């Protein structure tokens, strides 16, 4: 069983450095059970394209000829550093562009939100033929630019500073694993560029109350030293908010619920140590006040070894 522990640590180098933004159904490092070893750093550049034609106005699914197809392109730089074998530090910096294919809405572009994460492995034990681990993940995010969060659906973000805590359980037997996680996200209020707005009633202020959120996910897949294949289903729920009113635009404090299914595949090159490629996609199965989004992503990752014993 000691060899299994060693292999899991090696898998951490190869797999755990991919970190897409929160709420993506992908092999995010804040949502998987892999740790990068001490003094190793994984750098990643990832491109993501998402689009939708239909969206839910409350629970009513519809399209909007004044929007057409809403698309977004995300260019992300991410890093993951092993402080110890049981504590990782991660960051994500995304640059986002949006576009509506119809109507008069002008697409937006700019840096979105910086996300910083600490990922801790406090518990690990052998159960049967596998290894069971428990993780605690603390994350925070804040806007990197002065974008307009109220210009939905083409805004590049919601403009809220957040802090979140995720608990994750994972069980791996050989090269196969299953995992589950739950996350609570606290969001600060935001200011918008107008002095009054309507939710369920008229509010004379530029300050918007942002309801908190939670997220639960289950994942399963296959991991080896060269190949990683993973499937993920997750549910995101807003703890409050209100529905988009008929024929109106979305608002930052809307209830935004979604059930998403996704998957990824990642390959590590034996000929070039540390070089990896990844690709995957996600689809919103059902939602409330969100678009029925399809997205695809691809990226390049490279692992640097800064350990003193590296030769």
Model-predicted regions and their roles:
Residues 104-208, 253:
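Outer-membrane pore/translocation modules
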Residues 39, 71-75, 109-114, 132, ...:
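Residues that define the transmembrane beta-barrel architecture of outer-membrane proteins
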Residues 49-74, 153-155:
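Surface-exposed strand-loop-strand hairpins of Gram-negative outer-membrane beta-barrel proteins
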Residues 56-58, 63-65, 202-311:
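Outer membrane beta-barrel transmembrane domains
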Residues 45-47, 77-81, 91, 116-120, ...:
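Residues on the lipid-exposed face of transmembrane beta-strands in outer-membrane beta-barrel proteins
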Residues 31-39, 86, 124-133, 175, ...:
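Short loop/turn motifs that connect adjacent beta-strands in outer-membrane beta-barrel proteins
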Residues 42-46, 88-90, 117, 133-137, ...:
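Residue-level detector of the transmembrane beta-barrel scaffold of outer-membrane proteins
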Residues 47-53, 93-99, 122, 140-146, ...:
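Transmembrane beta-strands of outer-membrane beta-barrel pores
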């Amino acid at each position: 069983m000691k060899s299994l522990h060693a292999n899991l640590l090696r898998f951490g180098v190869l797999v755990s450095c991919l970190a897409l933004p929160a709420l993506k159904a992908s092999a995010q490092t804040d949502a998987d059970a892999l740790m990068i070893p001490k003094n190793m750093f994984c750098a990643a550049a990832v491109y993501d394209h998402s689009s939708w034609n239909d969206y839910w106005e409350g629970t009513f699914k519809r399209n909007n000829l004044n929007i057409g197809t809403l698309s977004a392109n995300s260019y992300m730089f991410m890093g993951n550093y092993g402080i110890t074998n049981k504590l990782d530090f991660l960051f994500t910096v995304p640059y986002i562009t949006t576009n509506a294919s119809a109507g008069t809405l002008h697409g937006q572009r700019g840096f979105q939100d910086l996300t910083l994460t600490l990922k801790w492995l406090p518990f690990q034990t052998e159960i049967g033929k596998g290894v069971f681990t428990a993780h605690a993940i603390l994350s925070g995010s804040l806007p990197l630019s002065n974008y307009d969060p109220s210009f939905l659906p083409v805004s590049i973000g919601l403009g809220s500073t957040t802090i979140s805590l995720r608990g994750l359980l994972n069980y791996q037997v050989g090269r196969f694993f299953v995992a589950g996680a739950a996350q609570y996200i606290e969001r600060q209020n935001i200011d918008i560029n107008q002095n009054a707005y309507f939710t369920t009633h008229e509010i004379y202020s530029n300050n918007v109350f942002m309801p908190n959120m939670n997220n639960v996910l289950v994942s399963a897949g296959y991991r080896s030293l060269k190949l990683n294949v993973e499937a993920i289903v997750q549910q995101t729920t807003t703890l409050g908010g209100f529905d988009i009113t008929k024929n109106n635009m979305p608002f930052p404090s809307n209830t935004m619920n979604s059930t998403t299914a996704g998957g990824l595949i990642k390959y590590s090159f034996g000929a070039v140590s540390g070089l990896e490629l990844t690709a995957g996609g996600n689809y919103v199965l059902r939602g409330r006040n969100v678009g029925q989004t399809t997205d695809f992503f691809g990226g390049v990752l490279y692992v640097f070894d800064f350990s003193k014993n590296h030769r």
